[in-house]
A protein has these predicted regions:
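Single conserved hydrophobic/aromatic residue that forms the stacking wall/gate
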Residues: 1-14
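Beta-rich, blade/repeat-based domains predominating
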Residues: 11, 15-28, 32, 52-68, ...
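A short beta-strand motif characteristic of beta-propeller blades
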Residues: 11, 44-50, 88-93, 132-137
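Short loop/turn segments immediately following the C-termini of beta-strands
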Residues: 30, 74, 116, 160-162
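Structural motif
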Residues: 34-36, 78-80, 119-123, 164-174
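Blade-level signature of beta-propeller repeat domains, shared across WD40, Kelch, NHL, RCC1
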Residues: 144-178
Length: 178
């Protein structure tokens, strides 16, 4: 309760990135290589979904309209696409090493995965069930976060170092549009 500054309820999980959409909360159970779905009406875990082929699921983005979760697997450098209705992985792509964060541009239907090895992988969503790798290109080493402006489709990448020296810089990339 934000007005009373009081915890109303809690759900026991050990989790990273959490997204709430349409009465559900989606959670990466990183240490278990699983994905949880929590029902907000009951505050109970509705499902735990195994993520075969994904180790140390960390970053996550959602396509709420298409009912897909895009999950970066830090332990084996892949991105998996999870069908939230069927509760199964429908696609998998290699990424650079150290994939951490994921961002989804719903307008261009692109998934961005910055990686600590100094690369960013981009996957194109042709429709909810079909995906293809667009490219992996160089960015600064150690990048972890990315944001996409849904209007301009510019991609913002936070950099921790430049030319091997500590820095706090945001690089801006223009998305190539069809």
């Amino acid at each position: 309760d934000g007005i009373r500054d009081k915890l109303v309820t809690g759900v026991q999980t050990c989790a990273l990135p959490i997204y709430a959409v349409a009465g559900k909360v989606y959670v990466n159970l990183q240490d278990l290589n699983r994905f949880a779905v929590i029902d907000t009406a009951t505050d109970a875990v509705e499902a735990e979904i195994a993520l075969p082929g994904c180790r140390t699921n960390h970053g996550m983005a959602l396509d709420a309209k298409g009912r897909r979760a895009f999950i970066a697997c830090e332990g084996n450098n892949v991105l998996v696409v999870l069908d939230l209705e069927k509760r199964q992985i429908i696609a998998q792509f290699e990424t650079g090493r150290g994939s951490d964060f994921v961002e989804y541009d719903a307008g261009l239907r692109r998934i961005y995965v910055p990686c600590g090895d100094g690369t960013m992988t981009i996957v194109q969503q042709d429709d909810a069930d079909h995906y293809r790798p667009l490219e992996t290109f160089p960015v600064s080493r150690g990048v972890h976060t990315v944001a996409v402006d849904p209007t301009t489709h510019r991609v913002y990448v936070a950099e921790q170092s430049v030319d091997g020296r500590p820095a706090a810089r945001i690089s801006v990339y223009e998305a190539v549009t069809p």
